[in-house]
Amino acid sequence: MNHRPIVATRDWHPQTSSHFTSGGGRWPPHCVADSKGAAFHQDLLLPAHTIVVSKGLQPNENGYSAFDGIDDKQTSLLNILTAHSIEGVVVCGLATDYCVRATVLDARRFGFSTFVVVDAIEPVNLNDTDGDEAEREMQDAGAQLVDSSTVQRLFVQDDGSHRRR
């Protein structure tokens, strides 16, 4: 069976990082490599063929965009998508105003059709309007804001198989 790749991205920060407040950064420690906080949520059912891309691996790296990450073979997300002749991506996750935004803007910059699943994202909102502003910026860059039922219609056929996109 010919699968389109499913790529799951994650923050995978070292214990000591300039990304964290303790290292002069903006954020409390989170998603420290090999910790429970860096694990995918137990309700996220990832198929066996899922490609995992980790970002924020280096002590001096923020790793906001998934396009800054690599898989276990040291392959960048851009190279993974290109190798599979992927033309479009669906983006969801945390946080709308940081990682989602950076990933979507990079996806558009690299020429990918980009869908943002608005009922599967959540902002940090350091300022009350950050999430809304990020959504506008992504839309202005050409991303399509959709809900999860639209993704289902776009990519899954009635028989459960996936549409080629």
Spans of features found by a protein language model:
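Short, charged, surface-exposed secondary-structure boundary motifs
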Residues: 63, 125-128
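Structural recognition of alpha->loop->beta junctions
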Residues: 33, 37-51, 128-160, 165
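A short glycine-rich beta-strand->turn/loop micro-motif centered on a GG-aromatic cluster
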Residues: 90-93, 113-125
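Generic beta-sheet signal
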Residues: 9, 55, 117-119, 148
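Histidine-anchored nucleotide/phosphate-binding helix
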Residues: 98-111
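Active-site alpha/beta core segments
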Residues: 1-88
